Amino acid sequence: MAKPGFYICPLILFALFVYGLFQSPVEYDSYYDSLEIQLNYLYPFLVLLPIFTCVYGDELKSGTMVTAIGRGLSRTKVILAKFIDTLVLSLTFCLFFLLMDQITFDRFSVVLTKVQILRVLSAYLACWLKIQGFCAFAAIFVYLTWNSSVGVIAGLISIAFSKMILDWLQSHTHLPFYDLTLLGQADQARRQFDAGNAWVHHILFVLLWYAVFLAFSALFFNRKELDL
């Protein structure tokens, strides 16, 4: 039988789908203006809790992770497996949000140009990279405390305040506090893609940030004493 947290994800997706069916008529310009807030705050907030409940919460409660380690699975492989789990789930959510937008466009007969479609796709790609970054950052606190709730709190706080704080620091010090972070690099990749410029190197910097978060997770997890 699937883990209890597994059912949270489809339930939330279904609720969002129903909500999308009753949206007011939209035009591309107003839609794209509101998309920025949705992708930076609303969507990460919506998906972090169900992802963590599904990937970490149930496993910690049931002891599945400890059992796997006791049977010889390395802690590094556990961390990587959980990272891939969150990667797949966050992608699933983003694809569903994109599908909701498409259904809304079809319902109100909104036809997008090729350029507009590419802008929407790049926005969702950046959103996916950010959500995975929030999950990878929050996972550090799970391995540090062995408590998924602490990870959720850390993730929600980072979603709510990280961009605001980093933007403030950058504007007041004129140092690239935001631009060099995972969030900033994801935004740079999106902007450069939209402008038709080179953007892949920004994705590589995002992957580097993932590696840093995974390294910290491994550092704390390897020091954690478990009752095997």
Predicted segments — roles?
Residues 17, 21-25, 167, 171, ...:
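Transmembrane helix-loop junctions and nearby membrane-interface residues
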Residues 1-7:
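N-terminal membrane topogenic signal
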Residues 160:
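Active-site oxyanion/phosphate-handling segment shared across diverse enzymes
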Residues 208-228:
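Junction motif at the cytosolic side of a transmembrane helix
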Residues 55-88:
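Helix-loop-helix units of permease transmembrane domains in multi-pass membrane transporters
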Residues 170-191:
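Short hydrophobic, aromatic-rich alpha-helical segments embedded in or entering the lipid bilayer
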Residues 6, 12-55, 80-149, 155, ...:
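Secretory targeting signals
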